[in-house]
Amino acid sequence: MADVVVGIQWGDEGKGKIVDRIAKDYDFVVRYQGGHNAGHTIVHKGVKHSLHLMPSGVLYPQCKNIISSAVVVSIKDLCEEISAFEDLENRLFISDRAHVILPYHAKKDAFKEKSQNIGTTKKGIGPCYEDKMARSGIRMGDLLDDKILEERLNAHFKAIEPFKEAYDLGENYEKDLREYFKTHAPKICPFIKDTTSMLIEANQKGEKILLEGAQGTLLDIDLGTYPFVTSSNTTSASACVSTGLNPKAINEVIGITKAYSTRVGNGPFPSEDTTPMGDHLRTKGAEFGTTTKRPRRCGWLDLVALKYACTLNGCTQLALMKLDVLDGIDAIKVCVAYERKGERLEAFPSDLKDCAPIYQTFKGWEKSAGVRKLDDLEPNAREYIRFIEKEVGVKIRLISTSPEREDTIFL
């Protein structure tokens, strides 16, 4: 059976810590979508690890780690991540169906961002997915056969010829790209496998599989705050499509949310706090992007969005992250509905334009940092947790009270 860990906000919820905390109980840990635009930060034995493509199970020697087919892969960046770890043989596997991000994709991404102003990381994620959908991309499996790779490269060069000047690719682009593959492909090829068959077989044998998503539900290309979204499907349903596991294989869906809200880049954010309180949350929560170092926009917990995300993903349990960031705040707000043009909205709309938050205020607490038992939390903190559970209709099974792995309350 497989369990899914999915972000149910705008990403950066703390999925990495949760996967790292529970990975020891699984045989496989699988990253199922996105690219190196995402980032997991894990603190292990006092050392901070920033992972962008590698599954979070790499810190456990017994885990097999898979990058599955719906992930788009920068082979240069993956090589750098691989070099930071030892003994990855028979522990890391990359789907032969996953698509390769080319330097051209990053150039195109930056070019388009100038006019679209979506707030992308400009790492080529969207353009790589564009080529995938246009059936013109290069897949990881193509790297295993020089003849096939050459065919794919020639087709790529022909397709981009009209855009070379616009995307500032340079006169030596063809030579440089071939050299790029010669440099990085040999380091990657030993890890490329038919991971779909691997996972189907593992599931049939009853091995335990953990599927981890990137970004968050509200950035989903179909169900998120379009057009201010990522280029992949970020919900739990994507885990099945990417891995080849059918929906019957899914057991638990663990939704990850912070005790407040954050968002990186542009796009609507009804519960954003632009007062000094927002700055306080950003500073105390160290809310700066793992990948881009951009400051995250911060605000209060949005239960309208949270209920929507829980429903989309079929969440069976929740993990509440960064409760300690709210320590010492006298009055804590929670968005319980929106107001738009005089109308109260309790369902998440397809367009958040003109939506203003309707808040309910709770009394704060002094300290939750480092607490590892529910009974040791102050009454006001416990009341906050119970309110979230009641409103969302999903049990909170885990509460994080610091970045450290051990500072976790299990319920």
UniProtKB/Swiss-Prot annotation:
Residues that hold Mg(2+) according to the record: D12, G39
Keyword terms, alphabetized: Cytoplasm, GTP-binding, Ligase, Magnesium, Metal-binding, Nucleotide-binding, Purine biosynthesis
GO molecular function: adenylosuccinate synthase activity; GTP binding; magnesium ion binding
Assembly behavior: Homodimer.
Family the UniProt entry places it in: Belongs to the adenylosuccinate synthetase family.
Biological function: Plays an important role in the de novo pathway of purine nucleotide biosynthesis. Catalyzes the first committed step in the biosynthesis of AMP from IMP.
Superkingdom to which the source organism belongs: Bacteria
Name the record gives this protein: Adenylosuccinate synthetase
Catalytic machinery residues: D12, H40
Keyword Transferase: no
UniProt lineage: Bacteria, Pseudomonadati, Campylobacterota, Epsilonproteobacteria, Campylobacterales
PANTHER family: ADENYLOSUCCINATE SYNTHETASE (PTHR11846:SF0)
Cofactor: Mg(2+)
Pathway listed: Purine metabolism; AMP biosynthesis via de novo pathway; AMP from IMP: step 1/2
A GO-annotated cellular component: cytoplasm
Binding-site residues for IMP, renumbered to this chain: D12, E13, G14, K15, N37, A38, G39, H40, T121, R135, Q215, T230, R294
Keyword Nucleotide-binding attributed: yes
Annotated gene: purA
InterPro entries: Adenylosuccin_syn_GTP-bd, Adenylosuccin_syn_Lys_AS, Adenylosuccinate_synth_dom1, Adenylosuccinate_synth_dom2, Adenylosuccinate_synth_dom3, Adenylosuccinate_synthetase, P-loop_NTPase
Subcellular localization, as worded in the UniProt entry: Cytoplasm
Stored NCBIfam families: PRK01117.1, purA
Major enzyme class: ligase
Catalytic activity: IMP + L-aspartate + GTP = N(6)-(1,2-dicarboxyethyl)-AMP + GDP + phosphate + 2 H(+)
SMART domains in the cross-refs: Adenylsucc_synt (SM00788)
Positions contributing to substrate binding: T290, T291, T292, K293, R294, P295, R296
EC number: 6.3.4.4
Ligand binding (GTP): 11-17, 39-41, 296, 322-324, 400-402
Cofactor note: Binds 1 Mg(2+) ion per subunit.
